[in-house]
Structure formats: C-alpha cells, structure tokens
From Swiss-Prot:
PANTHER family: NFAT, NUCLEAR FACTOR OF ACTIVATED T-CELLS, CYTOPLASMIC 1
Gene name, Swiss-Prot/TrEMBL: Nfatc1
Name of the featured protein: Nuclear factor of activated T-cells, cytoplasmic 1
Described purpose of this protein according to its UniProt entry: Plays a role in the inducible expression of cytokine genes in T-cells, especially in the induction of the IL-2 or IL-4 gene transcription. Also controls gene expression in embryonic cardiac cells. Could regulate not only the activation and proliferation but also the differentiation and programmed death of T-lymphocytes as well as lymphoid and non-lymphoid cells. Required for osteoclastogenesis and regulates many genes important for osteoclast differentiation and function.
Segments carrying motif Nuclear export signal: 312-323
Residue ranges: DNA binding: 440-447
Length: 717
C-alpha cells in the first residue's frame, strides 16, 4: 500500500508517543531516509519535499477556532499519516522529541535538536507555541495562551492512520463535506444537537471520522472562542448525502451506545481517557452567541428522502427554502432552544376575550402555556392590535359546569337519534313556516349558498307554545334524514352556520357525536319565536363518511333531508322535558330536484279501510303517467302489501295529482294500520315515502265515503 501523507490540524505538544482512542494504526519506528534536514524557516512555510508520492490536502484550522470544535488547534502543523502493519489497529501519534529509536542517527538532526522524520511525507512546523507538563498523553495537555510569533517554538507531531478509504463517505466528494464537518458548535451546541440535526449525532453517525475526538473545553474557554468559529454555521457547504436515521428522542438518549469511534466537532463532550459525562436530551443552560440557520429535521422529513438528494447544491437549496423566516428576529439564541412562550412562537397575535361576565380578569399570557387556552377564547389579530369589536349579545350561551364527584349529576340529554314528541302537556314545539322543498347544498370547497328559505318567501319560523317562564331557552337545530325509516342525523349533510349583514338571528355552533348542531336562543320577549335565517346545508365528502363504521346504511344517493328542531325545558322537579319537531323533506341535489317527483302536501292522511276517497297531492315534477303506490311494510322492512292507486289523468298537473285511495287488504282491523305511499315517474324516479293511516271500518264509514264522492262531483276540484 503506498504511503499517504496529509496535513491535519494539531495542538499536540512534543513528547513521547501515546496511543489514543480510535481504530487506527500505532506508531512504528520511521524507516531511514536519505533526505537532508530542512531548515526551520522552510517548515514555517509548509515546504513540501519533492519526493512525496501521494498527498491529500486538508483545510487548515484557523487559530481563532475554539478547542471545542477541533482539538488539533495549530494553524499550520504537520502530521504524517503512515500505515503500519506491525501493530494492532488504534490511533497513535508520535512527536519529534520521542525516543531516538524512532528516528535516524543523531547526526541527522534539525536545528532545534529534533531528528528528521521519514520521507516521503509532508512536514509542517506549527506556529502556535504549546507547552506541556509532565503528562504524556494527548488528553492531559493543557492549552496555554498563544505566545508572540517571535517566541513560538516549532512543534511537529506524527499521527499514523489506516487506509483513508475507511474514513471516507463514498458519496462525499471531499473530506470537507463529510458528515463530521457540518459545523463548529459552541458550548450551546446541545440545542442544535437535540433538535436541528439528528444525523449529526456521534452515536448515530454511519461514517467514521479521520480525526480524533477532541478534548472537552471549559465553558469559560470555549464560549469566547466560539464567537469566530460559529460563523461556519452559515456556510453554504452541506453534506451531499442525507441521513437515514430518525431524530433524537428520549428513548435514544437512554439507550445503549455503540463502541465505534465517533465524529469530532465537539459532538461527544468527553475526553479521550474514557470519562463520559451524563448525556441528557434537555437544553443546555448556556445560550449560543449566534442563531442557528438550520431548521428542525424530524423523522417524517427524512423518510422517503434518504437517497434522493446527492448534490450539495440541492441540499443547500432545500435548506434555504425551509429556513424559518423568524430566525433573524431572535436575540441570537436558536429558536429551538428558547423557552416556549406566546411572544416567541406565534406569527399571529392571540387575544383573550372573556366568555362571560363571570370570567374575571385574564391572567398574563406568560403565566400559562398556550394549550390551556380554549378555542372559544382565542381571536386572531394582526400585530397592529386592530380588529372589529362585535358587541356581545344579551343572551349568554350555556357553559359547561364543573361538578365534583360527590355532587348530583342529572341524566344526560337524549341522543340525537332518539324519537321525541313534538308536544307534551302544555308545551308544543311547532314549525309555523315550513322550509322550501329544494335547497342547493354547498360543498366544503365552495362558498356558502345562503340560508334555507321558506316556500312563500322569507325563512322558516319555529315557535314554542305553552312556555310562560321568563328564562330564555336554547333551540337546537341539526340536519336529519327524510327517508321512510326512523328519524336520525344525516351522515352526508350537516348544518352550516350563516353570518352576514342580513342575518338577524344569533346562533352558536357545537358538535355532538360527530354532528354539527346549531343553537338558537328562544327569548320570552319574542314569544319564544325564532326566525331561522342563519342555517344553511353543508354536503360532506362521500369518501370521508363511508369510512366511518355504521354510516354506509344511509347511502350517498339519499339527498333528501329535514330540519330537526329540539328544545329542552327544565321542570320544577329537576327533570328536563325534551321536545322535537322535523320539517318537510328538503331536496339538496339540483339534479334530483329537477327529475324526481316531490310530494309537499296531501289533502288527507287517514281514511277507513274501505277506501274510495279522492286525495289531492301537491308537489313538483308530476307527469301524466305518474303512478301512486301504497305499501305496507313489516318491522323487518319486508313488503307485506303493495297496491297501485288510480289516478285522475284529466286533473293531473305538474304540481298537483289526484288519486283514489285504494281499499286496505284487511277490512276487519280493530286498530289503525300505518302504511306508506310514493309517487313514481319511472324505474328509478321515485319520491320519498309519505305516511298514511287506515282506520277500522264502522257504520259511518260508508256515509263518509258517499258524501266525499258527491263533494268531488259538485266541483270542489
């Protein structure tokens, strides 16, 4: 193997050779060389012998760099890297003042008394005057003040290393771009080691470093010298290879560490004698004098990008694009190392608004973390602290009360899928004005299409009758199904809160069991009457809803909904009376509203089993060949009875249809029988099911049938 020599920075003093930690080659006696002794003046200028076979230049370190960044601290020292096969692998270093057995005879000596090292090699004399005591190992050397140039004594150390290929990252273009030469860290580098660059950790570095791990410096010494060294943080040079490892977590700090040598640059802060301080993922108390230009790199950002970028220019561009714009606003301490507070983190000012009069004075924002804020008390504003102040309404929304475990807790309110009556005792919840039969619902990606309107203009009106108290109540509104099954919240449609200049009703939006519920106040001064001009209909994505368990039974083709209103009335005995009423069906699809028949009103909803009476249906999209089908279903949904009613085609209009009620299948029933009917314009063009009740037959049923037929012939229709 050819000898390879290259200069590397060194602060090693003159002394006997010593083996240090690492996996390299130990020193061996230098073979005789026929070269002559070079003068000390030539060594100061890094004179290179012409007999050098292979050289690998490395950048020399600046004398102002701290010892924490690199342990070899002379400006232009010379170290010869000579592979050796006679000694076990380890890092070793020999100095010029070692035993004579390592060098030539005493005749070939330098002016300073040191013998000539072997050739071919590169030999550079240090400018820095380093003094040492009796210690013979590198980690026992103490760095003293730099002497003037006239008093500096030359010192040369020899470091034998194994083959250079073992320390080179195959994807790196030069040793300067290795993972271990990313930056120079000060004593506050633990901030960036924990958060910014997980691949810079010495315990997780995949490539070994050709340099010996440096000695830890004292905080008093390392901090001032790091002022000039930390300018390297802004260097545009970055490693062309990315790291496949995840970020440093609490578990990785507590886990076992490997035994292989680690990279320098003060990443592992303990000396070469094996004394290892306790590693902690917590922040270092000493701040960094310069802000870090890097951003946090997490596991999510590294996965999938481990082999894509192999050029340092691409990595530099990515880092420039992802650099936090708020880094220059700080005081020099990296963003990741600062204490999390409201004045540092957010880019939008957050103002705390009292939720009610009983909230009291708001404590300072620095006394509690942001996660203690509630969503209702946060308002976004600009840095200029200007926003539109909206006057608070007289109606205060109910706040959740914190109850102790020993306090009495009343039963919870009924679920949204419970079937509740519309009247009970003196109370009745009634829809005074029904909504329009068609309303175009809007999607989440488009703008609102306004509030639901009434058929005759305006908006729906709901009123609670029989309530004589002076306390206001809350009217709840949600979107329910409009099929023939039991009423329940619709999975594909939600209520949408409408705001604007033309909205006169105050509303508040909450979520109950994945269903949006709009709360509207019912005030005694308004006779417990509310105009619903603040409710729209929102269409959710089918893919999002169908992933939920138990929601696919509704079907994406079910585009008809109802407005469901609820009110909870407290009783003197401590209980709560809940009433519910649902509106007429509302078609939310524009295409369905133009093609499917829709029944809005029927002239009668019950008749005796003998049938024969004329019934008028009002709605939309009725045709001359429209059919009306009466159906009786079993509890399991199976059709027990199905009959087509006769239609009067002469009286048929697009918005009205006259049919004859067919006789029921069982003429001897003793209790009312519930059936349904629908209008059909084709195979797949059916209206929603409408309810109808058959009554038991008696002596007056025949008279009622005959009288109704005579009224029809008299010209009522």
């Amino acid at each position: 193997m050819p000898n390879t020599s290259f200069p590397v920075p060194s602060k090693f003093p003159l002394g006997p050779p010593a083996a240090v930690c690492g996996s390299g080659e130990t020193l061996r006696p230098a073979p005789p060389s026929g070269g002559t002794m070079k003068a000390a003046e030539e060594e100061h200028y890094s004179y290179v012998s012409p007999s050098v076979t292979s050289t690998l230049p490395l950048p020399t370190a600046h004398s102002a760099l701290p010892a924490a960044c690199h342990d070899l601290q002379t400006s232009t020292p010379g170290i010869s890297a000579v592979p050796s096969a006679n000694h076990p692998p380890s890092y070793g270093g020999a100095v010029d003042s070692g035993p004579s057995g390592y060098f030539l005879s005493s005749g070939n000596t330098r002016p300073n008394g040191a013998p000539t090292l072997e050739s071919p090699r590169i030999e550079i004399t240090s400018y820095l005057g380093l003094h040492h005591g009796s210690g013979q190992f590198f980690h026992d050397v103490e760095v003293e003040d730099v002497l003037p140039s006239c008093k500096r004594s030359p010192s040369t150390a020899t470091l034998h290393l194994p083959s250079l290929e073992a320390y080179r990252d195959p994807s790196c273009l030069s040793p300067a771009s290795s993972l271990s030469s990313r930056s120079c860290n000060s004593e506050a580098s633990s901030y960036e080691s924990n958060y910014s660059y997980p691949y810079a950790s010495p315990q997780t570095s995949p490539w070994q470093s050709p340099c010996v791990s440096p000695k830890t410096t004292d905080p008093e010494e390392g901090f001032p010298r790091s002022l000039g060294a930390c300018h390297l943080l802004g260097s545009p040079r970055h490693s062309p290879s990315t790291s496949p490892r995840a970020s440093i977590t609490e578990e990785s700090w507590l886990g076992a560490r490997g035994s292989r040598p680690t990279s320098p640059c003060n990443k592992r802060k303990y000396s070469l004698n094996g004394r290892q301080p306790s590693c902690s993922p917590h922040h270092s108390p000493t701040p960094s004098p310069h802000g870090s230009p890097r951003v946090s790199v997490t596991e999510d950002t590294w996965l999938g990008n481990t082999t894509q970028y192999t050029s340092s220019a691409i990595v530099a561009a990515i880092n420039a694009l992802t650099t936090d714009s708020t880094l220059d606003l700080g005081d020099g301490v990296p963003i990741k190392s600062r204490k999390t507070a409201l004045e540092h983190a957010p880019s939008v000012a957050l103002k705390v608004e009292p939720a009610g009069e009983d909230l009291g004075t708001t404590p300072p924002t620095s006394d509690f973390p942001p996660e203690e804020y509630t969503f209702q008390h946060l308002r976004k504003g600009a840095f200029c602290e200007q926003y539109l102040s909206v006057p608070q309404a007289s109606y205060q929304w109910a706040k959740p009360k914190s109850l102790s475990p020993t306090s009495y807790m009343s039963p919870s309110l009924p679920a949204l899928d419970w079937q509740l009556p519309s009247h009970s005792g003196p109370y009745e919840l009634r829809i005074e004005v029904q909504p329009k039969s068609h309303h175009r619902a809007h999607y989440e990606t488009e703008g609102s299409r306004g509030a639901v309107k009434a058929s005759a203009g305006g908006h729906p009106i709901v009123q609670l009758h029989g309530y004589l108290e002076n306390e206001p109540l809350t009217l709840q509104l949600f979107i329910g199904t409009a099929d023939d099954r039991l009423l329940r919240p619709h999975a594909f449609y939600q209520v949408h809160r409408i705001t604007g200049k033309t909205v006169s009703t105050t509303s508040h939006e909450i979520i109950l069991s994945n269903t949006k519920v709009l709360e509207i106040p019912l005030l005694p001064e308004n006779n417990m009457r509310a105009i619903i001009d603040c409710a729209g209909i929102l269409k959710l994505r089918n893919s999002d809803i169908e992933l939920r368990k138990g929601e696919t039974d509704i079907g994406r083709k079910n585009t008809r909904v109802r407005l469901v209103f609820r009110v909870h009335i407290p009783q003197p005995n401590g209980r709560t009376l809940s009433l519910q009423v649902a509106s007429n069906p509302i078609e939310c699809s524009q295409r369905s509203a133009q093609e499917l028949p829709l029944v809005e009103k029927q002239s009668t909803d019950s008749y005796p089993v003998i049938g024969g009476k004329k019934m008028v249906l009002s709605g939309h999209n009725f045709l001359q060949d429209s059919k009306v089908i009466f159906v009786e279903k079993a509890p399991d949904g199976h059709h027990v009875w199905e009959m087509e009613a006769k239609t009067d085609r002469d009286l048929c209009k697009p918005n009205s249809l006259v049919v004859e009620i067919p006789p029921f299948r069982n003429q001897r029933i003793t209790s009312p029988a519930q059936v349904s009917f629908y209008v059909c314009n084709g195979k797949r063009k059916r209206s929603q099911y409408q309810r109808f009740t058959y009554l038991p037959a008696n002596g007056n049923s025949v008279f009622l049938t005959l009288s109704s037929e005579s009224e029809l012939r008299g010209g009522f229709y």
